Design a protein with these regions (language model features):
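Short, structured beta-strand segments at or near domain termini in extracellular proteins/domains
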Residues: 159-161
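Feature responds to low-complexity, polar/acidic, surface-exposed segments characteristic
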Residues: 1-7, 15, 20-93, 99-129, ...
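Short His/Asp/Glu-rich catalytic/ion-coordination signatures at enzyme active sites or charged loops
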Residues: 138
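Flexible glycan-contacting loops in extracellular carbohydrate-active proteins
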Residues: 132
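Short, T/G/N/S-enriched strand-turn elements that build extracellular solenoid repeat scaffolds
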Residues: 173-178, 183-245
């Protein structure tokens, strides 16, 4: 992998425990990501512990991802429409949807005109269209050769790159000090005061969140254990999203 264009990002994802080797201690950065691998990594990001019903997913007996798929169902990343697809390479457009489900980036009525520059985006509809527009508008996805390449399989390197463009640090809320270049995914209870942030996500481990004089573009709460959320002071949060599951 040395010298690969995404080497730094892949190493960081490995260090953060999000990306594992693909066998024989190799990262296989140019290999495609399967749906099972994608949701497994996103569940690691969100610290999902709950498990949903996977009976409709047609998971092969003994599949390595059985428990991870159950977590993904619980977190709202998978449903019966994904039946029989978990071992298949995930397309870029379907990956866009997963990133949106995990990070809640698309607004109800996003600016779809940002997709006009990509001729292959005309076939996008519904959630894939909204997710793609949100990722493009935020500068997370830019496409290649003038296209979004929506039907091409997403590689491991591309997955990690999108992930770290969305959020460049995955740390405990207690260790968070303020603004970073991208967003931040925080775990555990939080008591933040007087900090400026771009976008922040509280993962599923947060129970109590207190934000005092906090300024942020977006705050998203993904916790299913939340008992209290207090926002006060003179800060400004442009968008607050409560998405427990």
């Amino acid at each position: 992998m040395k010298g690969h264009w995404a080497e730094k990002t892949l190493n960081q994802a490995y260090s953060d425990g999000i990306l594992k080797g693909s066998g024989s201690k190799t990262m296989s950065p140019n290999s495609s990501v399967t749906t099972a691998q994608a949701v497994t990594m996103l569940c690691r990001v969100l610290h999902v512990t709950g498990q949903g019903d996977t009976s409709s997913l047609q998971i092969p007996q003994g599949a390595w991802y059985t428990q991870d798929a159950a977590k993904a169902v619980y977190a709202g990343l998978l449903d019966n429409r994904d039946a029989g697809q978990l071992d298949q390479s995930i397309s870029r457009k379907d990956a866009f949807i997963l990133f949106d489900k995990a990070f809640q980036i698309a607004e109800a009525q996003p600016d779809l005109t940002v997709l006009d520059q990509f001729p292959d985006a005309t076939s996008l509809t519904g959630q894939s269209q909204r997710a793609a527009a949100a990722l493009v508008e935020a500068g997370i996805v830019s496409g290649s050769d003038g296209k979004l390449q929506i039907d091409r399989p997403l590689t491991r390197a591309e997955f990690a790159t999108i992930l770290y463009r969305l959020a460049d640090q995955y740390i405990s809320a207690a260790a968070f000090t303020g603004h970073t270049g991208a967003g931040s995914v925080l775990s555990g209870d939080a008591d933040l005061s007087g900090v400026q942030m771009g976008t922040i996500w509280f993962d599923q481990s947060a129970s109590n969140i207190r934000l005092t004089d906090v300024t942020a573009k977006q705050v998203t709460v993904r916790s299913d254990q939340l008992t209290s959320l207090a926002i006060s002071g003179t800060g400004e949060i442009s968008r607050l999203v409560l998405a427990a599951r």
